[in-house]
Swiss-Prot record:
Superkingdom of origin organism: Eukaryota
Gene induction: By phenobarbital in susceptible CS (16-fold) and in the LPR (1.6-fold) strains.
Reported cofactor(s): heme
Name this protein carries in UniProt: Cytochrome P450 6d3
Pfam families xrefs: p450 (PF00067)
Purpose of the protein: Metabolizes pyrethroid insecticides and other xenobiotics.
Effect of residue 4 to Y: In allele CYP6D3v4
Length: 520
């Protein structure tokens, strides 16, 4: 009798699961065949492919405009059409204004950042933070970025002091560069990870990106933040927390309190956030922007330390990996494309000469803005290797797909594979070729609707211009002072990681040597 009940129960579960995982077929939608209980993510669970590449594989597998997929238990939709994707992100933003990822403002304030927040909470914070990344603010912070760029230059000079060509893991080196910029500009710390790689901030950074050192629960939470928020919320309620996040919170708290008590002013993003905390707004671009900010009573603060810390951590995660990746992938591609390398290097030389800057001297904000071909290179890199290989949204009100009978129902998650769109020959001829000129006005050769490396619409990356600036500074320093040795073409491969970014297998190794005028 017991055996009969067990068989009946298992059969009922199987029938229910089968029905659940055929939801899209029953609605007449082309869909991926689900693997119970992983849905479309069996390869993610088996650590064979990261989430972004699984979405890319599904993009390549089908031809339809909208494809049904399953994020573990949750039915979702993969958008394969550039115009529809852009419509979701822009003109019909009101139907897709949330990301549908884990956030718990009340019980987990460190989750309440600009990326995850929903509805009015997101709108209010976005409006407050937007002035932080204006041209005037970036110009004010530029000197700090250039300082880190000079430390990068000094480190490379030491590595190449014998005058020979050395093959270096440029991804690892530029990760150090990016982390030091974040530590300095976002967290207000005076650090130099090139000479002191064991400093606390660098150690914490390494831990946050080291997939192997994470516990199983930490990896699970990192994945479920995106694909199954209720499980992420449950794990948090059960006490699963990321130690690195809370240690960085302590660093932010300590720095803010020290600055408020001692009226310390530094031209960085943290100063602007302290200004927002004490006055309720960030000043316009003017001469008084970087003046000291009088502290207000704790109960009158417009922004809590937790909110500053959570958004600082967001800028750190988003900024460090994307800057390191875009810069290192650009160098990697230039090494395989000598014509583009020559154009980029010649432009840097000419711009520095025009602005009266020595190759190893201080670069100015204006000189970086003049490097237009370098802009094309960065655009092409972020096309081929988008910092975030997918975008996700949640339908917040029923939405009828144009020229279709299909309606996306409220609460349905949608995924846009940026890697898929950006490598689709329909939108970008010869998608695996590195062709910066495709973005030049006079030789434009792409469908603009499909290009969205920083997202589009009201929720596009708020720090986009800062990321491009940081990338161009590093590229200009390297191109002005070093030869990038040509190498045979080899497409980068990506390893499994629970973080939603593209992580190259074994880094990116490129040969560098000092340019003749730079020999010591």
């Amino acid at each position: 009798m017991l055996l009969f009940l067990l068989i009946t129960l298992l059969s009922a579960i199987f029938i229910f699961a089968k029905r659940h995982y055929t939801q899209w077929q029953r609605l007449g939608l082309v869909s991926d065949e689900a693997v119970i209980p992983f849905g479309s993510l069996a390869k993610v669970f088996r650590k064979e492919r990261p989430f972004g590449l699984v979405m890319y594989d599904l993009y390549e597998k089908f031809q339809e405009q909208v494809v049904g997929i399953y994020l573990f238990f949750k039915p979702a939709l993969l958008i394969r059409d550039a115009e529809l994707a852009r419509q979701i992100l822009t003109s019909d933003f009101n139907s897709f204004h949330d990301r549908g990822i884990y956030v718990d403002e009340k019980n987990d304030p460190m989750s309440a950042n600009l990326f995850a927040l929903e509805g009015q909470s997101w709108r209010t914070l976005r409006m407050k933070l937007t002035p932080s990344f204006s041209s005037g603010k970036l110009k004010g912070m530029f000197e700090t970025v250039d300082d880190v760029g000079n430390k990068l230059l000094e480190y490379l000079n030491n590595q190449l002091k014998d005058g020979q060509t050395h093959v270096l893991d440029i991804k690892s080196i530029l990760t150090t560069y990016a982390i030091d910029i974040i530590g300095s500009v976002i967290f207000g710390l005076e650090i130099d990870s090139f000479t002191n790689p064991d400093n606390e901030f660098r150690v914490l950074s390494d831990r946050s990106f080291d997939n192997e050192s994470r516990s199983f629960l930490s990896k699970l939470q990192n994945l479920t933040n995106f694909v199954c928020p209720p499980i992420a919320k449950l794990l948090t309620r059960l006490g699963t927390k990321e130690p690195v996040v809370y240690r960085l919170r302590d660093i932010v708290k300590r720095t803010i309190e020290f600055r408020e008590e001692n009226n310390v002013v530094r031209k960085d993003l943290l100063h602007l956030l302290i200004q927002l905390r004490n006055t309720g707004k960030i000043s316009d671009d003017n001469d008084n922007l970087w003046n000291k900010v009088e502290s207000t009573a704790t109960n009158l603060k417009a922004m809590s330390i937790d909110m500053i810390a959570s958004n600082s951590f967001l800028f750190y995660i988003a900024g460090s990996e994307t800057t390191a990746s875009s810069t290192s992938f650009t160098i990697y591609e230039l090494a395989m494309n000598p014509e583009a390398l020559k154009k980029a290097q010649n432009e840097v030389d000419e711009c520095l000469k025009k602005h009266g800057i020595k190759p190893d001297g201080r670069i100015t904000y204006e000189a970086i803005q003049d490097m237009k071909y370098l802009d094309l290179c960065v655009k092409e890199t972020t096309r081929k290797y988008p910092g975030l290989p997918f975008l996700n949204r949640q339908c917040t009100q029923d939405f009828k797909v144009p020229n279709s009978k299909f309606t996306i129902k409220k609460d349905t998650n949608v995924i846009i594979s940026l890697l898929g769109l950006h490598r689709d020959a329909k939108y970008f001829p010869e998608p695996l070729a590195y062709k910066p000129e495709r973005f030049a006005d006079e030789t434009k050769d792409y469908d603009a609707a499909a290009y969205m490396p920083f997202g589009e619409g009201p929720r596009h990356c708020i720090a986009q211009r800062m990321g491009v600036m940081n990338t161009k500074v590093a590229l200009a320093k390297i191109l002005a002072n070093f030869n990038i040795e040509p190498m045979p073409h080899k497409e980068a491969e990506f390893q499994f990681n629970t973080a939603p970014v593209l992580v190259p297998v074994n880094g990116l190794r490129v040969g560098l040597s000092k340019r003749s005028f730079n020999r010591r």
